[in-house]
Amino acid sequence: MSRLGGLLLALALAACGGGQSNTIQISPGPVRGMLLQNPPQRLATFSAASLLATLVSHIAPPGVPLDLSVAGSEYLLAQGGTPVCDIAVYHIRYATVGGAGESTTASGALMVPSGLDARCRGGRPVVLYAHGTTTARSFNIADLTGQQNAEGLFLAALFASQGYIVVAPNYAGYDTSTLPYHPYLIADQQSKDMIDALTAARSALPAADAPLTTDGGRLFVTGYSQGGYVAMATQRAMEAAGLRVTAAAPMSGPYALAAFVDAVFYGEVDGGAPIVATFLVTAYQKAYANIYPSAADVFEAPYAAGIDALLPSSLSRSDLYAQGKLPQYALFSPTPPGPVFADSVTPPSTLVTLAPVFALGFGANDLVKSSYRSSYLSDAQANPDGAWPASTTGVAAASPGLPLRQALKQNDLRNWTPAAPLLLCGGDADPVVFWLNTQLMQGYWAAHAPAAASISVLDLESAASASDPYATAKKDFGLAKQAIAANAVLHGATDGGAAAVAGAYHATLVAPFCFAAVKSFFDSQ
């Protein structure tokens, strides 16, 4: 026997326990939802007073003074109340899956309240939160010192400091995750990620810094923007699996995904579309492996090379734009993609106020090849969505031919009805995630949900009635818009502040008011 053969035999016998068995023992890998470090790392503790100081120093809408009581952090404090509980913030790491079902890891935040007040100990409700789109590969919602982590501070101030246990995943592909991409808007994966984070967090309770705080059995699911979509997908998945959700409140999410992307390709281009398109198309390629043979089939030459691995990134958004990795606004060429679409790529829209936003989506150095846009539009015309641009079935196209539209149909959420009470919150002038998504979900549920379903919709732009539980939120939201517009005019804006309002609308204006409304909704359950 050769020395190599003898060595291999010796190793095999060693693996078999010295030759006592002919079966090699292989240690199983971590299962989904396994907490990979127990106890988890504690990142910070906050007294109620120190959390209040941190919140006020970190969060305020751009251009709005901190002493404006109806906006940003001070509005949240007014609606959520002064922090009652001390909180401990833990960084959890757990096992989950990627977009193609591959084993991977992810991380997130576990915020645990404690204190002498009865609201801060014993069996407490759990909020499971899904965050919005971020390009930062290093994003960690558990790091409450980060200047860009408004969501983490919102959660700490509104929920954890008021006695809710908070679980908030960073998602696979971020922070310490071993996945080299993020499975963006893939309903099956993102809901599994959320459920796995919840499972891991529950196994870490009671936490060392809050030994008297336990999971009380009530679960609330919410999220904003991308996270609004993820929250809805998670409620759907949990209820389908027989897991109890007490209530849910998706905020400003792209729920009717197939219709939303159709609208974008027809010419109603949302703000920030190049980032979303890159995340979406490359994630679907990694999950389904059929979106394109080559990235150059979809993306223009200046961007195609390396775009599969571009997001999330170690570069800031401004650096991504400055270095020519992505265009800031121009998704499409201003030249129609062929004569057949010359007069039909921008259908009439009731969203007149968003016309300037749509226009920004067309320009030089655009991201998506006209040939691919033409293929998409041809398929959309041959296999139209059932709710946009014309309402027929109310659901995604029955048999789309283009692989991207097939993937969008697979991930569209117009195919279920909630069992637990649900609140949808947003604003109908949103230039980033169109209110169309909420309208189409509302329309679908009006036709398909049982009469007993408890579904509420809060449009912050709508007029308040005398008995409206969200009348204050609507009024104060309007005042915040006026303040941002007035501040822009004061600093030289000649458009009445419209651009400033549009720029702040999705991430800064709507978010705090929806967060406060969601807290009120959860408290009432």
Model regions: which residues?
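Catalytic-loop region of hydrolases
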Residues: Q20-D117
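Short, surface-exposed "cap/lid" segments of acyl-processing enzymes
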Residues: G98-S107, M111-G163
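Alpha/beta-hydrolase active-site loop
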Residues: Y184-A208
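Primarily recognizes the serine-hydrolase "nucleophile elbow" in alpha/beta-hydrolase
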Residues: A200-G271
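Accessory cap/linker subdomain of secreted extracellular hydrolases
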Residues: P254-N415
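C-terminal catalytic histidine-bearing segment of alpha/beta-hydrolase fold enzymes
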Residues: D262, P400, R405-Q406, A429, ...
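Short alpha-helix in the alpha/beta-hydrolase fold that links the catalytic acid
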Residues: A420-P421, V433-A447
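Short beta-strand/loop motif that positions the catalytic acidic residue
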Residues: L423-D430
